[in-house]
Amino acid sequence: MIRNISLSIKDIFQNMQDAEEFIQGLSYDQFVADKRTFNAVVRSLDFIGEAAKNVTNEIREKYPLVPWKEMAGMRDKVIHFYFGVDREAVWIAVKDRIPAVRPLIEQILKDLGKR
């Protein structure tokens, strides 16, 4: 059964917000020292990547600026962590990549609401 695309996009948006909220006010050193926060952020990245994998080709083609493949790839890296999770990559994803992509995801939600 194919999941409603709106739900997948909402999951991406919500987990982006969550990840940003989890690290709010933390330095990199505080983040990597806080196991609970680190694990919560990794879980959010898992949800984002899994939901990105469920996005249809139609949506991917309509919104090519969204790094769909990279979001799914990050999920695989943090979940399968073959040689340990790269904490700096997780930090950069949440501090730099998510804030850049979140407005694009928000626009998709608005566009889907107009259907």
Language model region names:
Residues M1-R115:
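Solvent-exposed interaction patches of small proteins and small membrane subunits
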